């Protein structure tokens, strides 16, 4: 279900980009160095997941705003409605047109600047997300994808990150050549596939005053639940997902090693054929006969098709994401452990 929804995001990206490209480009053509998000957008994304997100099913939506110099300002958003395969009459392009027309009538920013998606235990580095973001970023250079992690957020801190495809990966995706030689030539590794853009959440002055008043009213006892260490399920699930991706990587390595063995075997066969051919020509020349005609050796020995390596890079990137999440999670729990111990000693 997640992959189907991600794939539909790619179609929406192409439409939204074509609608907003000209207007967005007038505000600034430089690369995005910061993403500024209104607090209302964050609340809408969280509300969307709470209403429609279930288990590992992701929710997605469109980000609206504008580009100012090297800063991308996200001022509003709207969700993609959940629908099943049976909803054949649903037209996502028409849905986006109607939403943007309605927003324009009430004088709200209606230019597409990217999209958002929830994630399940950090599982977002997929081919579907890559294709969707490429569709957006190819049409509007400043487009970003926001990844919201509801499970991390439930642990006590908002988890919202903005990502873009690196220029190197954009060039490779344009060429659509994901062979080992092409990725090696472009110097593409999982570390430089995505770039994270810093996020700043901005609220109005009235909202800041209200938050300050709420913070003064909240008692210290209300926050003790944030020191809870009952999180073995989260760690266990993350480790299980990590092991699954490692198994996939192991299978992919076996396939690639098989390809390398086949290439090496064919090279040996070509070398042996050339040696036999050369010896036959020498014998024919000694008998005064004409040498054998030259043949296209590549037609006789068709090279094996190299496997695409993009999936391997995505799996490696996902493994790295899981490792970073586990590292951060354990660091937070260690901090909670020391704080809980200090609080207990203080109360005693």
UniProtKB/Swiss-Prot annotation:
Database matches in SMART domains: JAB_MPN
Cell compartments where the protein resides: Cytoplasm
Domain of life the protein comes from: Eukaryota
Gene3D superfamilies associated with the record: Cytidine Deaminase, domain 2 (3.40.140.10)
CDD domains, per the entry: MPN_eIF3h
PANTHER family: EUKARYOTIC TRANSLATION INITIATION FACTOR 3 -RELATED
Similarity remark: Belongs to the eIF-3 subunit H family.
Descriptive protein name: Eukaryotic translation initiation factor 3 subunit H
Taxonomic source organism: Gallus gallus
């Amino acid at each position: 279900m997640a992959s189907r929804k991600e794939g539909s995001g790619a179609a929406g990206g192409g439409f939204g980009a074509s609608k907003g490209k000209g207007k967005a480009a007038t505000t600034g053509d430089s690369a995005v160095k910061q993403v500024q998000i209104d607090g209302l957008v964050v609340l809408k994304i969280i509300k969307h997941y709470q209403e429609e997100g279930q288990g590992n099913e992701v929710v997605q939506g469109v980000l609206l705003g504008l580009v100012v110099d090297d800063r991308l300002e996200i001022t509003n958003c709207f969700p993609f409605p959940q629908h099943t395969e049976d909803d054949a009459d649903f037209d996502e392009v028409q849905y986006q047109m109607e939403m943007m027309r309605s927003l324009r009538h009430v004088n709200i920013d209606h230019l597409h600047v990217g999209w958002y998606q929830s994630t399940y235990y950090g599982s977002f580095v997929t081919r579907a997300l890559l294709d969707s973001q490429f569709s957006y970023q190819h049409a509007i250079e400043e487009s970003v994808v926001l990844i919201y992690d509801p499970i991390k957020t439930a642990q006590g801190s908002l988890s919202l990150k903005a990502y873009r495809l690196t220029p190197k990966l954009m060039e490779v995706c344009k060429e659509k050549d994901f062979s080992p030689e092409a990725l090696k030539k472009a110097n593409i590794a999982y570390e430089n596939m995505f770039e994270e853009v810093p996020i700043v959440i901005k609220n109005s002055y009235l909202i800041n005053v209200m938050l300050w008043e709420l913070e003064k009213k909240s008692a210290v006892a209300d926050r003790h639940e944030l020191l809870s260490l009952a999180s073995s399920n989260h760690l266990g699930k993350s480790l299980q997902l990590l092991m699954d991706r490692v198994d996939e990587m192991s299978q992919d390595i076996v396939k690639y090693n098989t390809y390398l063995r086949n290439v090496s075997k064919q090279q040996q066969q070509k070398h042996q054929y050339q040696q036999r051919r050369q010896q036959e020509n020498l014998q024919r020349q000694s008998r005064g006969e004409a040498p054998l005609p030259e043949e296209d050796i590549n037609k006789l020995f068709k090279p094996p098709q190299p496997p695409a390596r993009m999936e391997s890079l995505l799996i490696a990137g996902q493994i790295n994401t899981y490792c970073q999440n586990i590292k951060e999670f354990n660091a937070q729990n260690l901090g909670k452990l020391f704080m809980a111990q200090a609080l207990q000693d203080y109360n005693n």
